[in-house]
Amino acid sequence: MLFAILGHIMAQKATIYKVELSVSDMDRHYYETHKLTVAKHPSETDERLMVRLLAFAMNAQERLEMTKGLSTDDEPDIWLKSLSDELELWVALGLPSEKIVRQSCGKSDAVIVYSYGGHTAQMWWEKIKNSTTRFNNLQVVNLLEAETSALGQLASRAMKLQVNIQDGEVMVSVGESIVYLTPEIWKGV
């Protein structure tokens, strides 16, 4: 009987996604394919997972890595570390608190926050934007709610994802499905 009770309180496990991510970034002249194994936290939505993959594509380079993400408080969703293990890029998703933004700006050479969530994201930005002006290494990019919602519909456990970036606009395709995104720069560096 005790085993049956314990079985119900065991933590849910992450779902594994296999992703072949082809990035064609005409703005940065970056053209590579990344084979990623991505763990989706039980509390993570398909929309957030796809925003994470989009953020990876928009910053793709050789040493860029996905971290433990939602399962740890002191790591970003994505980071780039130097060969000497110093943080060069900290990529956060969603609506981090001003405290987390401040701490991440102190830990990394560059910080990018990809906010999403429509009106909630706008309220978050209005609340913290005045306290972020002193951070010269912070960039805030907002993704429109309708676009990220459509992106979430593309999620599947095995994906071949093509991301094309040109003139700040993004096209994401999985099979025959295509989503166009126009990220808004709320704070540039």
Predicted region positions:
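Short polybasic amphipathic segments
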Residues: 19-21, 78, 169-173
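Acidic-basic catalytic patches of nuclease active cores, encompassing PD-(D/E)XK
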Residues: 25-70
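Long amphipathic N-terminal alpha/beta scaffold segment
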Residues: 65-83
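Feature captures the catalytic cores and cofactor-binding loops of soluble hydro-lyases/lyases
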Residues: 96-153
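Non-catalytic C-terminal interaction segments of nucleic acid-processing enzymes
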Residues: 137, 143-189
